[in-house]
Amino acid sequence: MAQTLSFNGRRRVRKFFGKIPEVAEMPNLIEVQKASYDQFLMVDEPEGGRPDEGLQTVFKSVFPITDFSGASMLEFVSYEFEPPKFDVDECRQRDLTYAAPLKVTLRLIVFDIDEDTGARSIKDIKEQSVYMGDMPLMTNNGTFIVNGTERVIVSQMHRSPGVFFDHDKGKSHSSGKLLFAARVIPYRGSWLDIEFDAKDIVHARIDRRRKIPVTSLLMALGMDGEEILSTFYSKSDYKRDGKGWRVPFQAETLKGSKTLVDMVDADSGEVVVEAGKKLTPRLLRQLQDKGLKALKATDEDLYGNYLAEDIVNFATGEIYLEAGDEIDEKTLPIILDAGFEEIPVLGIDHINVGAYIRNTLAADKNENRQDALFDIYRVMRPGEPPTMDSAEAMFNSLFFDSERYDLSAVGRVKMNMRLDLEVADTVRVLRKEDILAVVKMLVELRDGKGEIDDIDNLGNRRVRSVGELMENQYRLGLLRMERAIKERMSSIEIDTVMPQDLINAKPAAAAVREFFGSSQLSQFMDQVNPLSEITHKRRLSALGPGGLTRERAGFEVRDVHPTHYGRICPIETPEGPNIGLINSLATFARVNKYGFIESPYRKIIDGVVTKDVIYLSAMEEAKYYVAQANAELNAEGKFVEEFVVCRHAGEVMLSPRDTINLMDVSPKQLVSVAAALIPFLENDDANRALMGSNMQRQAVPLLRAEAPFVGTGMEPIVARDSGAAIGARRGGVVDQVDATRIVIRATEDLDAGKSGVDIYRLQKFQRSNQNTCVNQRPLVAVGDILNKGDIIADGPSTDLGDLALGRNALVAFMPWNGYNYEDSILMSERIVSEDVFTSIHIEEFEVMARDTKLGPEEITRDIPNVSEEALRNLDEAGIVYIGAEVQPGDILVGKITPKGESPMTPEEKLLRAIFGEKASDVRDTSMRMPPGTFGTIVEVRVFNRHGVEKDERAMAIEREEIERLAKDRDDEQAILDRNVYGRLLDTLRGQVSIAGPKGFKKGVELNNAVISEYPRSQWWMFAVEDEKVQSELEALRGQYDESKSRLEQRFMDKVEKVQRGDEMPPGVMKMVKVFVAVKRKIQPGDKMAGRHGNKGVVSRIVPVEDMPFLEDGTHVDIVLNPLGVPSRMNVGQILETHLAWACAGMGRKIGQMLEDYQKHLDITELRTELVDLYASESHDEVARFDDESLLRLADQAKSGLSIATPVFDGAHESDVSEMLTRAGLHTSGQSVLYDGRTGETFDRKVTVGYMYMIKLNHLVDDKIHARSIGPYSLVTQQPLGGKAQFGGQRFGEMEVWALEAYGAAYTLQEMLTVKSDDVAGRTKVYEAIVRGDDTFEAGIPESFNVLVKEMRSLGLSVELENSKLETADTVNPLPDAAE
């Protein structure tokens, strides 16, 4: 038997239903973010040897900066980062940005310029390190901390630079003719469009300006008309042959055309092909084989052809005809009269080769390079008179200047591929050859050769990740800075300055700040649970600067494309206006150095599927035949079926097995992380799977997390990579554990420079961005032996290192008194009383004491006109105690603000004069709990400005913090001492000593007894004979001293930070933050969901005894509506329910066996059952467990067996039936249920089982809202709207109709006036109510006045006339409304 395994019970072992072995390791899920930013900063690269990437390139592209006269130059040497001032946690607490100071070494070179020759010689060189602002650092979890909040930079999808060929789909012209166009898109610089118009003339546009003929562009590149024609067309010579002409036979040009007249051999005179025949390649080959060299042609055949060269009289220099002119009845005699026997003709036949470029040249008004350049200059800078120099300089700067134009490596690679060029990817500007190749390719497309590009193909879209976005932003900042530096260099005495004096780093720092603070791609991290964090970091957005906008994005961009397979998830995308524009990276996908998304494949060599994995981008994949991961293989790794389903060039087909070159790595490689967490995804409709993926991201972490019975095997990966569950950084032994930290003595990876101790601080009840609770719990005990990567602590929504978003609840699918109508959920009271779906939310309240004009505000317990009862929770500093239970209206922090002095009466002045100064007026501006919030205070933080005296509470918090730091230092010191003195003792033992502490005899052999007579600190005094050992001792001593001083230094730094005052916004003297933990039990109105898009609202909570129950008396927890399944087609929830029911049954069975074992102590039966149960092709570890491990596993499984059914490779119906049978349950998965109210059985059996339910972050407590008296809008005087503004309910148009329909006139009047915006009426009603009177009079609503004012502003005179009606007998009938 193989080596036995021990199982520590700190992870969950799942029965695995997948058949396909995992060949490739899944890449780290936040690799996209980390790799990209590391490549940008290159912190670990040596300063001198950094490659030209990221920050290094930015500096190199902007520097050297030369002043306007050329007398001095500022060069970039290198850059380095200093250690950040505060660590991640300190930044979070103090609302700072986690960043490292960037120091750049610059070299200023001053030249002497010889006035006569203009030669430069170096006069002076100065080098200096200059501070260039702070550069934000990424945390280990792939986020940034900006002003104390965690943010994520989302990667952007954009069109790759390069050349694209497209047509207008026949929309531009009424005839429906396809107009082809090519567009060269650089990474930065001017766009070049080359396009056909309806008359088949080729135009060029620069930056979408006015179009110019493409021949003008070519002339500007230095070509003349004849050269342009010879570039685009072949040439054939017509030679005079008696009366007719002789023309060379060219098989290529004739392919596929029809003969209009007989083809006659010029040499023999015989007819080789008759008129009206099609020239097939076979026929042409036969003619070539026969030796046909030339054909006979008449004058008529010459007509309609175009001259390939100018027809010139060389004697006089007279040009008879120019290249490109048409030969017809008028021009042919001119040529013949001039005595030309041979006419060069362009190879245009209007069928295979069109005359587009020739026609464009004929239509082009520009004759030469100067005209063309002037024309381009006028287009780009209308209104400026061109000169040759300015026009040439402008044209060169458009496409050929690396400062202004950058194709980027990607753009060059794409151009090379599309145009079949071989140019190094360091050539990042356009060349004349590139432009010619683009025009040629475009003309060929018009001639019907080649294909247009699909811009939605992932080969043509690339990802810009953090590093690249940051690089572009920093470049902008440096360019702004460059202008300022140039000006300063020219205006200052350059001989006396240092680089520091020239540089103002503000623009660069501002660019960074602006990017992280306000860019559309820098987003507040979605931190509801670990899954939402990971998904946010893997998100790809097509929006943002330089991307699409929601309004303009069409259907094609949003749609799923065949190249998305294995790269972008086809399921996970938001519902609503952003659908398809925001996507998620697939599980195995990664981004390559060019920014294209790659997916992994297994190689197939000689028909055998190997374990070699290669990553391919969409472009590279197109040429392969790729089999799916679930294709059946035999033992040798060959395909079983003769024909295999595979993908090729975006199509799915059946292909013979020997044509297949690659195979997918895993069935879950085509979906994203969130979709891969849905078991039985293959049985759900795509729309519901989309909702399921999106709703898992909104799951609130519960008080007690519980991993699902039915998982997919992705759960531990998400928990680990998100950083929610803590893994051991290196192997070791647990030395100390409490709720707030774990101390591990490392046994692996003990480098000289590293400490031998790892201290893990656990987060306790911290607030996340979405107010959910982040709390970590240790899983290890003192003495546990750990390997690297073992999970040592659970975080929010994790259970034994598995992601656990919800709870397993016993559900029944049946109607129950209409309480589950329209997806409502009926719930048992047990769930409330046992806190099954209870969650903790943490709210943060912040109060600042500012320095006002009237004097400073003060935080104090001494508040005017407040009862002692209201102050019961405050300490002497006026701040609430930790642990206090608070409710709406309770004071959290007492604060008073000086009030403006009111003018004093003479009597007051007299009293003042007699009794001295009375206390200045203050008003109470304390912070109170908002309405509807109850909770417990869990943390208070006090921040003081530098130089402001700290209050008692601040001192207490500071002392506590310093004690905590000291404890950490002492523990680390103790472990260090234990390790070092242990090694010292081992080294000394058995050695002969030549020196020692005071009173020690030389020459004694050292042993434990001898050494331990002396205190440990004196052991270093021993010296031994063996020189090698002596040098080891000295090295150990040096290492120990260094570690000790490093530890002490670190402690001192941290203490200094704690004691130092805090940086505050201007005018703020003191700030207090109070954190309140709110316990939210589930209640009617809360939204819940399963993992299959089955969402609903809790409608009623029923006493346990009224809920339906099973034969053994177990009451179900939740009753769901069976009608929610058929129309939604998410059958996965039913399969999950059945399988989880079997898991619970198996758990009971294993529990029974455990009890039997405890009676008889015979483990054989339990071992057989478990080994058989967990046996799987890909997981056989349970068979190797020792007895103790087996008992631990059984203990874990007795509450319900955990299983994994991976997506697209999970349990089948037969597996579900087998599990049910094994657990001793009916294979239908249905049970007899009894009505809890009557005790009678229901008519039919009901589907009962466990479903994994999650509580979503849409809680009724956050939404319910009522208003008494509140704020009004300034202009309309109507109440504000929304809970945040304490607003009113909108009584809209349709509600008014309803009251009109009922004829409730007075209610309606009240709604439109005194309850809304009749200002005077409101006051009167209030007074009337105070008086006890219940009558009121409505006035004019303010909104009517607003309307009148608006009409007046449009110049309409609106007057309100109050004319009395005449007496009753002479009443005029009112005019009819229609008149």
Swiss-Prot record:
Coiled-coil boundaries: none
GO MF, one example: DNA binding
Pfam families, per database record: RNA_pol_Rpb2_1, RNA_pol_Rpb2_2, RNA_pol_Rpb2_3, RNA_pol_Rpb2_45, RNA_pol_Rpb2_6, RNA_pol_Rpb2_7
GO terms under biological process: DNA-templated transcription
Enzyme Commission code: 2.7.7.6
Keyword terms of this UniProt record: DNA-directed RNA polymerase, Nucleotidyltransferase, Transcription, Transferase
GO terms under cellular component: DNA-directed RNA polymerase complex
InterPro entries: DNA-dir_RNA_pol_bsu_ext_1_sf, DNA-dir_RNA_pol_bsu_external_1, DNA-dir_RNA_pol_su2, DNA-dir_RNAP_su2_dom, DNA-dir_RNAP_su2_hyb_sf, RNA_pol_bsu_bac, RNA_pol_bsu_CS, RNA_pol_bsu_protrusion
Reactions performed catalytically: RNA(n) + a ribonucleoside 5'-triphosphate = RNA(n+1) + diphosphate
Keyword Transmembrane on entry: no
Subunit details: The RNAP catalytic core consists of 2 alpha, 1 beta, 1 beta' and 1 omega subunit. When a sigma factor is associated with the core the holoenzyme is formed, which can initiate transcription.
Family matches, as PANTHER family: DNA-DIRECTED RNA POLYMERASE I SUBUNIT 2
Family: Belongs to the RNA polymerase beta chain family.
Role this protein plays: DNA-dependent RNA polymerase catalyzes the transcription of DNA into RNA using the four ribonucleoside triphosphates as substrates.
Protein's recorded name: DNA-directed RNA polymerase subunit beta
Source organism of this protein record: Allorhizobium ampelinum (strain ATCC BAA-846 / DSM 112012 / S4)
The gene coding this protein: rpoB
